[in-house]
């Protein structure tokens, strides 16, 4: 039996019929909507999820990263402080530890929205199913 997802405003999609590239495209569309719904629901802009393009070290191929505004801000401030000799450059693990309270607030905001919004829960469910399908290929 084929897995069918009902995607907002797009009807039904049979996941098994999608190529890896098409799956990635569907994931991108759902992620964009998921983050937009979340960002519209919050009052604290520091919790907003920001997506941006970057070029990984050693590559010429652009990649996209999506992360909370507080992570982007802290990483930038830490890099400037390290460059000026005021602080050590934080590793990703150190950054997560330093920002534990902010991550807890983000988790609470997402949980609250999930409890209040069936649409947000549906987007999350579709996104999980698409990612699982892509990972299984």
What positions do the PLM features span?
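Sec-dependent N-terminal signal peptides
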Residues: 1-3
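N-terminal secretory signal peptides
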Residues: 5-75
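Primary mode marks residue(s) on the alpha4-beta5-alpha5 output face of response regulator receiver
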Residues: 19-36, 42, 83-137
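Extracytoplasmic, post-signal-peptide low-complexity/disordered regions of secreted/exported proteins
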Residues: 51-53, 61-62, 68-71, 76-100, ...
């Amino acid at each position: 039996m084929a897995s069918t997802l009902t995607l907002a405003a797009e009807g039904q999609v049979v996941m098994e019929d999608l190529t890896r590239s098409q799956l990635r495209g569907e994931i991108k569309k759902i992620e964009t909507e998921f983050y937009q719904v979340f960002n519209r629901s919050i009052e604290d802009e520091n919790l907003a999820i920001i997506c941006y393009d970057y070029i990984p070290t050693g590559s010429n191929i652009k990649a996209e990263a999506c992360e909370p505004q507080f992570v982007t801000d802290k990483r930038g401030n830490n890099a400037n402080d390290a460059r000026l000799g005021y602080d050590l450059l934080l590793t990703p693990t150190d950054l997560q530890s330093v920002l534990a309270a902010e991550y807890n607030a983000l988790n609470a905001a997402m949980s609250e929205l999930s409890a209040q919004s069936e649409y947000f829960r549906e987007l999350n469910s579709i996104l999980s199913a698409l990612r699982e399908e892509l990972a299984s290929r």
